[in-house]
UniProtKB/Swiss-Prot annotation:
Gene: Ada2b
Stored Pfam families: Myb_DNA-binding, TADA2A-like_3rd, Tri-helical_Ada2b_C, ZZ_ADA2
Subunit structure: Component of histone acetyltransferase complexes containing Gcn5 and Ada3.
Organism of provenance: Drosophila melanogaster (Fruit fly)
Subcellular location: Nucleus
Name of the molecule in the record: Transcriptional adapter 2b
Length: 555
């Protein structure tokens, strides 16, 4: 049987010593005795060889009947050389394969391999079982384009919208989709001199793998930047000066917002980035609109048609408060002569005769007011801290003589000597007067004589109780010293603490009970009411717990 080694072995005729090409005649009785067909036909006999010895025809690989039958069949030697050349030079490199075979052209080599080893019997017996053993991947994404594997997400990026001159200036090659000078051009230097060797230690191998990993990361960054350039069309925007900061139809606030948010564009595609900006701008518009609607509802408006008249009214009354969510500051307080308060006055500034004017008007609201009756307007939370009392001002009120005076006034008011004195003290609580900032010393001077005669107050109170029990509400007034009467008269003219004219009777009683100044109470009330109108917020929960703990709320 002929082996692969025999295919490339040269044989010579023992009789004529010529090279045997093709079939030779081998003597079965003599050792290493081969004859060519010409010498065998002539009946040559040499040495011990006789022409009547047994013989057999041997094929050296050049016979046309060796592998494939038919017209134009290749010899076994040529088939072996074809397979070796394809393994060495690769499928498709038919020019080099033809040179390796030496007897066939490139077209013949391609046709022979495709017909015999791909589409022929060998190909059907070899490739078909291999294809059937491959795992089958099932597409579970469906027909819709939603999700990360949808058609929209996997679609190719749009081409750069530039002409040939602009591409030449940038060094951009459209067919290759790359630039002559790429981003981070020195990245290839990390692995340009790397080569694996059998003498490398484990540390050397790990170091080379680390270099490859760094190079891969830099390639990813290069690809990411190229994707952003293509997705956002930065090249065309550069030449046409159509960046986002100069887009037509954008306000100054929108341009500033887009400039601040531009750093996040690297995490989104162009369409996602535009949708995100549009959503954020829409959210801001809805918040502003919600604040406007809250302001309208705060002022008692329930129909959109009423808002136009309300805005016209708020524009004319520039110093009136239209609610905690509005912009038109108004003031429902007037002086006794009907003039408006100066614009420079704050919420906590003293306001003379506020409740007298309200009572004299018969409880009617001001003609310029749209808010409901008996509605206390607070400062606009959208404004700066100008409407809130300063820290030094609040600290001066806390623990001041005015606060002590308010408590002592309440104690003295409880010592009612007669009905006239009771009426006078009560009218002092209802009638609000101006409180100068330097009233602390005067209040101390008025209260000092009272503190020196506590027994007089106690004895007068006991004497009045005895007379009421005995006389049943007689009009006789017990005798008192002239000094005590003078002090009680002076109590009627004591000024109230700042901010008292803005509080109701219940709120004043609450301030007295918990020993806090009206300005402090107004500040706390302003902070509580000017927050976002949302229920269940952490701020609301904290304040509610604090109020319940202090006893301001029952539940």
């Amino acid at each position: 049987m002929t082996t692969i080694a025999d295919l490339f072995t040269k044989y010579n005729c023992t009789n004529c010593q010529d090279d045997i090409q093709g079939i030779r005649v081998h003597c079965a009785e003599c050792e290493n005795f081969d004859l060519c067909l010409q010498c065998f036909a002539a009946g040559a006999e040499i040495g011990a060889h006789q022409n009547n010895h047994s013989y057999q025809f041997m094929d050296t690989g050049t016979s046309i009947l060796s592998v494939f039958r038919g017209k134009g069949a290749w010899t076994a030697r040529e088939e072996i050389r074809l397979l070796d050349a394809i393994e060495q030079y690769g499928f498709g490199n038919w020019e080099d394969i033809s040179k390796h075979i030496e007897t066939k052209s490139a077209e013949d080599a391609k046709e022979e391999y495709v017909n015999k080893f791909v589409n022929g019997t060998i190909g059907r017996a070899t490739w078909t079982p291999a294809q059937s053993q491959r795992p089958r991947l099932i597409d579970h994404t469906g027909d819709d384009d939603a999700g990360p594997l949808g058609t929209n997400a996997l679609s190719t990026l749009p081409p750069l919208e530039i002409n040939s001159d602009e591409a030449m200036q940038l060094g951009y090659m459209p067919n290759r989709d790359s630039f002559e000078r790429e981003y981070d051009p020195t990245a290839e230097q990390l692995i340009s001199n790397i080569s694996l060797s059998s003498e490398d230690t484990e540390v050397d191998v790990m170091l080379k793998l680390a270099h490859v990993d760094i190079y891969t990361r830099r390639l990813r960054e290069r690809a990411r930047r190229k994707r952003m350039v293509r997705d956002y069309q930065l090249v065309s925007n550069f030449f046409r000066n159509r960046n986002y900061a100069q887009q037509q139809g954008l306000t100054k606030e929108q341009r500033e917002f887009r400039d601040r948010f531009r750093v996040y564009a690297q995490f989104y595609t162009c369409n996602e980035y535009e949708r995100l900006l549009g959503s954020l701008e829409r959210e801001k518009e809805l918040r502003i609109r919600q604040s406007e609607l809250y302001r309208y509802r705060y002022n008692g408006l329930t129909k959109i048609a009423e808002c136009t008249h309300f805005e016209q009214h708020a524009a004319t009354a520039t110093h009136r408060s239209t609610g905690p969510y509005g912009h038109g500051k108004t003031d429902h307080t007037h002086t006794s002569n009907g003039s408006h308060r100066p614009p420079s006055s704050s919420l906590h500034s003293p306001q003379p005769n506020l409740r007298k004017v309200e009572m004299s008007s018969g409880g009617e609201a001001s003609s310029n007011s749209i808010a409901p009756r008996n509605t206390l307007h607070i400062a606009d939370p959208t404004c700066s801290g100008a409407l809130l009392p300063s820290k030094n001002y609040l600290d001066s009120c806390r623990g001041s003589s005015a606060a002590t005076m308010l408590q002592t006034t309440g104690m003295v008011m409880g010592v009612t000597v007669d009905s006239g004195a009771t009426t006078g003290v009560t009218s002092t609580a209802t009638t609000m007067a101006n409180l100068p900032t330097n009233s602390a010393k005067g209040s101390q001077q008025h209260l000092q004589p009272l503190q020196q005669h506590p027994q007089l107050l106690q004895s007068g109170n006991q004497h009045k109780m005895q007379n009421e029990a005995a006389g049943g509400g007689s009009d006789q007034v017990p005798s008192m010293s002239l000094k005590l009467r003078t002090q009680l008269e002076e109590l009627k003219h004591l000024p109230q603490p700042p901010g008292s004219e803005l509080l109701s009777h219940n709120e004043l009683d609450l301030c007295k009970k918990h020993n806090i100044t009206p300005t402090t109470y107004l500040s706390v009330k302003t902070v509580c009411l000017s927050g976002a109108p949302s229920l269940g917020s952490p701020m609301e929960t904290s304040l509610r717990k604090f109020f319940i703990k202090c006893g301001w709320l029952s539940h």
